[in-house]
From Swiss-Prot:
Record PANTHER family: 2-5A-DEPENDENT RIBONUCLEASE
Protein's UniProt name: Putative ankyrin repeat protein RBE_0319
Keywords assigned: ANK repeat, Repeat
ANK repeat ranges, renumbered to this chain: 377-406, 408-438, 442-472, 476-506, 510-540, 544-572, 576-605, 609-639, 642-672
Keyword Repeat among UniProt keywords: yes
Organism: Rickettsia bellii (strain RML369-C)
Biological process (GO), any one: RNA processing
Gene3D superfamilies: Ankyrin repeat-containing domain (1.25.40.20)
Pfam families: Ank_2, Ank_4
InterPro entries named among the record's database cross-references: Ankyrin_rpt, Ankyrin_rpt-contain_sf
SUPFAM superfamilies, per the entry: Ankyrin repeat
Amino acid sequence: MKEQDNLSISQELYGTILINLKSIVQNIFPLEYNKQEITISYIVEQIASSGSIQKNSDYPELDEEIEEINQAIIDYCKYKEIPKEEENNIYKKTSELIKDGFLKNIEQTTKLEPTTELEKKYLDKLNQATSSDEKKIIIDQHKLEIEAFNKQIAQDFQKKQEDLRGNREITNVEEHKLVKEGIVTKEEIEPYLSNYPLLNTLVEYIYLDDDQDIPLVKKLFEIARNFYPNNSTQELKELMELSYKKVNDLVGTNSSNILELLNHKQISFADINNVESEELHKINEIKIKSNFKILDCVISGDCRVTLKKLIETGKIESFDKKELELVVALFEKDADTLNKHQETKLSSKVGKLLLTFHASKAYKLDDLMQFINIIDVAEELLFTATYYQNINIIKQIIETKIEISSSTLIKALYINFTSDNKEILDYLLSFKGLNINEHDENGGTLLDYAITFNKLDIVKKLLSHENIEVNKKNIYGFTILEQAINDDKLEIVKLLLSCKSLEINQKNQYQTTPLQQAINGDKLEIVKLLLSHPDIKFNEKDQLGYTSLDWVIICNKLEIFKVLMPHLDINQKNQDGYTPLEWSIYNSYEVFQTLLLRPDINVNEENQHGLTPLQLAIIDHNDQMIQALLSHKNIEVSEKNQYGTPLELVINNSNDTALKLLLSHPKINLNKTEIAEILRLHEAKLKEEVQDDSVPISNIELDTSVLGGLEEDQESYGL
């Protein structure tokens, strides 16, 4: 890989984790510059050494950001298919970029008196205080000084950042990163060189991509060029007039709303310019709709400062000015202004905008009620009242006798999951128009979601509903019982098993029963629960023809096997003609041992090919199982079938250890001459003196006249 390629990849990786680095500085240690410098330096060192950051016990608040950075590095290297031998070079170059760029900015930041000094000063005063009133005064003074201190730091930091950005004067347009990367042309950028902060901030985000791997900064400029069909420079001009402070909300990791609104021409860059920098992020947090314009976003996002400015400048589109002034009063909880608007009624449009969950945090729901027509906004009001657990408003909606659809009630019940308000749950479930088994757009029912979020009380309540369907399959072909089993929700399985209408042996699309799923998932406690049900079936077959017992043996699940064993016919053959004992010879010695302890086990049962367990073990050269079988009191060691006796099979398979075990078995009734001939044949087989392996050993007559070396041979076999 070329050096230039390494640098480019390192720059992209830097851009990928830049958001996390900024979060550490702005959100975790916003004013603590020493900690900023220490923690970012630590991250730089860790990335340089291994590409992975170890959690720092001195700063546990960094854990989440460290996890995200580590995952981002892993995902990026995997996506780019970076060769292992190049990774260390990439890590070192990335750490250098962080050090020379991000960390350097922190180091150059002016540091004021540390907050710890203020804390120490006021702690000394508190220790000297003699009364609670005196302590309260000291604490209040401390709060005021801290506020002033933080304000001064914030102002100084902002000024420093602006100076740093502004001082990066662009002297060679062709060498500017935006031009070199082909994001803008020299001609497009030249008229706006004076906006150094914006241009240089855009460069910081140049390597951030969207889901289609398109650089977000590039996407931003493409939107600007195509916004006005007959004037490609107009929106570009509006973009270049923006403050650098708004860049993160335009192309940061959480900028999807604004980009979507711009892309669909619902808002313009001029609209964004009218939004206060501190409020722009709120637009990225709301749930936007296809008909939203800038004022819709401002109201839904509680951008009250921006809204005031738009009212003052008359940029209110088709909205009524009085309505918007009332909205501001609601946001500010201004009782005097609200009283002045007693006669004002909010339109259905504004009422619905205010009843989004984001905006509704900004005002008192009870204040809003006097200004809306409940019939116009019944659905949105029901959702918001449920979210804020306002049972009185919910009852007020119902008392108006508005027709509420089942899907609306279902959605309200979903919302209530977050609070588990039993009164609201009972009230909403009591509606006759409710279809409790209705699927939402994702194919889930109320019961599905209650199980997913482990809401035991809600599951219990839903199961008691007269119309609940417990055997209904979801869009993936699974029942709620299977869902609870897969999620290992033992208490919910208990609740489901108490339902009389439950079909406990119902198969899914793979012909697997709930019991088989629990076994395959190694859910021992759930298996015990299912086995306790009176209607459980143990021998149901899946699409491969295997039963629960087959899978227990195949997967060597000994503990589950012990639980299953009392319920099974231990000598029943499976579809391949094997008994559990024979099946375990190939799969599980632990299960094999457990089966041998059963008094009803048939250790001599032949499979469909006519082989006994002992013969299978001999063919498999499994000396451990041969020894275990020979120790069983019912084992037959001299019975002859189409494969001969066990002794003959041992010789034919050249198994020295098995021969010793058989010859020493008390049920082997042979004289010394016969033993000598067996040993001779075995030695001949080992030495390949028997040339034709196709002739079964049972067809070779024992030569009882051969006695030479008998004592020596017997002694070598421990006889």
